[in-house]
Amino acid sequence: MEYLKRLALLISVIILTIFIMGCDSQSDTAENPKEGSKEAQIKKSFSKTLDMYPIKNLEDFYDKEGYRDGEFKKDDKGTWLIRSEIVKQPKGKVMKTRGMQLYINRNTETAKGFFVLKEISENNNRVNKDKEEKYEVKMVGNKIIPTEQINDEKIKKEIENFKFFVQYGNFKNFEKYNNGEFSYNPEAPIYSAKYQLHNDDYNVRQLRKRYDISTKETPKLLLKGGGDLKNSSVGQNDIEFTFVERKGENIYFNDSVEFIPSK
């Protein structure tokens, strides 16, 4: 009888040990995608793309090659389209956006774009054209300057001091980001990863300082990419930091770097 009790106890200990090891393995897989898995490939692809941040001198894009699909003509070196935009909607108020987009043409080595201020209608989520302000800009010597006279000194100064996220963003600790949610569509091909960030994250602190984001809520990071996962060149890379997302109250920051055919 005593022998049976000891045997039962031994079996129970073995089963418990196997169960604990299984849980640890599942937890580790959730935090760190298994090497060779689609999740690991997605994270590796983003890691290669984000490794180029920051590019402090935008003129470096003239020498940077991107992912070319069938839409590119043979003699077209391509154009980089970079965008950064902050979206704010205080509780119970109108949603407003302000940001810039710049077309960096590798054929002509010229860069032109727009600085845009918009109001978004809450009823249909569309831009209120009566409230939209659009200013043409160009890049000269890594500096953004208006191409037309601007009487509003505040806006003029904002344009001249504008920095794209790609110029100051830093993802050197991206490999340490854990518990990501991944998706992949091989037909497009497009893929994404979502992470919960902390307030001490470098990029979060930069955005709070540059755009006066006062909320203490920890943001979510959404990464969206396009192109061949195995290709080392950048095709399309979208970044979104969501600080607040509620009905009638929103704060988020959008940034994108995209390689497109020249017009």
UniProtKB/Swiss-Prot annotation:
A lipid is attached at residue 23 (N-palmitoyl cysteine). This is Uncharacterized lipoprotein SACOL0482. Belongs to the staphylococcal tandem lipoprotein family. It is found in: Cell membrane. It is a lipid-anchor. Keywords: Cell membrane, Lipoprotein, Membrane, Palmitate, Signal. It comes from the Bacteria. GO terms for cellular component: plasma membrane. The lineage of its organism: Bacteria, Bacillati, Bacillota, Bacilli, Bacillales. It comes from Staphylococcus aureus (strain COL). A lipid is attached at residue 23 (S-diacylglycerol cysteine). Residues 1-22 form the signal peptide. InterPro entries: Csa, Csa_sf.
